[in-house]
Regions:
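An extracytoplasmic/periplasmic, membrane-proximal ligand-sensing/linker region
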Residues: 197, 301-343
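A bilobed periplasmic-binding-protein/Venus flytrap-type ligand-binding module shared by bacterial periplasmic
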Residues: 135-142, 180-183, 261-276, 283, ...
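Extracytoplasmic ligand-binding site segments that recognize negatively charged/polar headgroups
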Residues: 38-45, 81-82, 86-210, 214-224
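Periplasmic-binding protein-like
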Residues: 114, 132, 160-171, 196-205, 235, 284-307, ...
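Early extracytoplasmic/lumenal segment of secretory-pathway proteins
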Residues: 29-93
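A ligand-binding cleft/hinge motif common to bilobed small-molecule-binding domains
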Residues: 90-94, 224, 229-248
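N-terminal secretory signal peptides and thylakoid transit peptides that target proteins
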Residues: 1-17
Length: 343
């Protein structure tokens, strides 16, 4: 009968441990990606399940506004956890400058070739997967007819009946532009450089403002229950989606125009499973998926081969200089919080 020494036992135990550990070394990465993006209705209940079924991978999603999304990417820059980020163009400009997103040009995204040139900013550093419109959201029970002009928000009939979105949210540029237009008469697309006049005009709106918030879902709920008349200014992704579900809300088409809110998608630099990230973005740009996106998010498609769904009636949208916005945003946030929300 063989005699086992302590050395034999230790050697055998070590071999067993290595054998047990081996599967974890060779185990493949799970077929899943972490996507950070807006908390928009229709993403997790319609769009993402379609992509998951079609391509056989799991989408882990966390909804937050674009600036918070960027902060999360910064915090994990050394070891990214996110594969794709879906953010507004002004924040994607910052992400590009900080080198936390990777260019789409040259990536395996065939549908990118059919996307409009103006929807591939910065030489396809990212891509706009839809183009929703922002204006006044209003309660259709309490406001009849809907506002024909942004000027109606300043009417004393709406005292304490308006919620303004925080300037930390990109859509907050719309009431600032509307105020600048009312003060100067210039077209909305030219009013970014008239922000000073816009802030002075916004001060006149304060008696009508119940609160300033960064919690868009809560503001949307208050709009739907009739606690407020106007919400300035979410976009069609949320408002018309809720209208279609029976909520008493609508998106105004003021005579001064609506503002394009290009929604971008980008690959996070050095993010995990980049090939699945490319598949995800390519599917967002597929003509059939683009038609679903246009219908679901009430926005203009960006793939030129997409057949626009019947009944989608958005006017020509004011397109902004988002780089100018990005360069001035911090200054405007400080002024907004000093003079409008905190003054």
């Amino acid at each position: 009968m063989p005699r086992f020494t302590r050395r034999h036992v230790l050697a055998a135990s070590s071999g067993m441990a290595l054998g047990l550990a081996a599967p974890s070394v060779v185990r493949a990465q799970p077929r899943e990606i972490f996507v950070g993006g807006p908390a928009s209705p229709g993403l997790t209940d319609m769009l993402f399940p379609l992509i998951e079924r079609k391509h056989g991978f799991k989408i882990l999603f966390e909804g937050s506004n674009s600036l918070i999304n960027l902060e999360k990417i910064r915090a994990n820059k050394a070891r990214p956890t996110m594969t794709v980020t879906m953010m507004d163009d002004p924040v994607l400009i910052l992400a590009e400058r900080e080198k936390v997103i990777a260019p789409l040009k040259g990536a395996n995204i065939p549908n990118l070739a059919d996307v409009r040139a103006d929807a591939k900013p910065r030489d396809a550093m990212w891509v706009n997967w839809c183009q929703p419109a922002s204006s006044i959201a209003y309660n259709t029970d309490s406001v009849r007819p809907g506002p024909a002009s942004y000027a109606e928000a300043w009417d004393s009939r709406h005292r304490d009946k308006i919620i303004l979105i925080s300037m930390r949210i990109t859509q907050a540029v719309v009431p600032l532009l509307a105020a600048a237009h009312l003060a100067t008469g210039k077209p909305l697309a030219e009013c970014l450089k008239e922000a000073d006049a816009g802030f002075e005009k916004l001060k006149e709106l304060k008696p009508n403002v119940l609160q300033v918030t960064s919690n868009a879902p809560q503001a949307q709920q208050l709009l739907e229950t009739g606690e407020i008349d106007f919400f300035l200014s979410p976009d069609t992704r949320t408002v018309l989606f809720r209208k279609a579900q029976g909520a008493p809300v609508d998106q105004a088409q003021p005579k001064e125009g609506m503002v394009a809110m290009p929604a971008g998608a980008a690959l996070v630099a050095n993010g995990p499973n980049p090939e699945l990230g490319m598949t995800f973005i390519n599917e967002l740009l597929d003509p059939e998926t683009q038609a679903l996106i246009a219908k679901t998010f009430y926005s203009n498609p960006t793939n030129t081969k997409t057949v626009k769904p019947a009944g989608l009636d958005l006017p020509e949208l004011a397109v902004l200089d988002w780089e100018y916005f990005a360069d001035n945003r911090n200054r405007w946030i400080e002024r907004f919080e000093r003079e409008i929300s905190g003054g």
